[in-house]
């Protein structure tokens, strides 16, 4: 009889632990959401801006009563702009901190590195700014636990090529690309296709890698070509220096980029004068008169005493997007939240209205 009692107790304990692992924080007074962003390192501008937006959104949600009466608790870590660290932190957030979803990272490479962990643990990861085309679907199929709320590199690469052709009447372009990132390679590929399909010619394509600082050899080389624009698919750290050094060499043609240019560090590195005739695509405009945008700007300025940038807006939208799904989820676990995310339609955010499709 004693053996039977011990056996029953063991079975009950196993059942309790199994229930905890499946429901995460279903019985807690709070809802845990992971925050895995680039708070230091090369891409810290993106991460810190996104987290400011996330924290504003969560502050507002909690002040309004939380999600179905439960407050959100953010579990925040710095992935140091390193994909390997982002992966490690995702594992920690899901297996130790017991979150129901993870927000971030900001960059495509780091975000993609976390997706296998999400799939293994059946807990969704969501990014506001991972723009690489293969973030949510690739040749192997749909990545079911990965979500994003931003446009893709094919979209913005195409948009910038059309801008060069139609708005700047460019016929010849040079590409100086970050060959060390999926982001840079994807943008270059899509810009090239659209520009050439529109009758333009890529007269030169040069490459650099992240952390390069001296681009004078590349710029001296392209000065021997005739071109109307330069497209730089890369991040602000290198782009700012390329722009500064190009202007110093007397290259005054329009310089184009994508959302990776969106950082005050670009201005610090390049200087205000060098940024004349520089254009880049972005997710958000502070001039938008949409009431949702106007209210966000007012609230953001009240909290942080500064104007919001696009990554602030994307972080804000991302937190609200995931919170909305959690409010509709059948249970507080990763699988239920993932299903609710998939069912999102016509979500109106600061950066636009969006719905989740099968890809």
Describe each PLM feature range:
Residues 23-28, 46-52, 64-137, 208-215, ...:
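Beta-alpha junction/loop-to-helix N-cap segments that form part of ligand/metal-binding clefts
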Residues 243-316:
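Extracellular/periplasmic periplasmic-binding protein-like sensory domains
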Residues 1-32, 63:
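Short, low-complexity disordered leader/linker segments with a strong preference
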Residues 34-53, 77-84, 106-107, 176-185, ...:
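Extracytoplasmic "Venus flytrap"
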Residues 98-204, 254-277:
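Extracytoplasmic ligand/sensor domains, especially the bilobed periplasmic-binding protein
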Residues 44-55, 158, 184-192, 290, ...:
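Short, surface-exposed alpha-helical segments at coil->helix boundaries
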Residues 302-312, 323-359:
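Segments of small-molecule ligand-sensing domains
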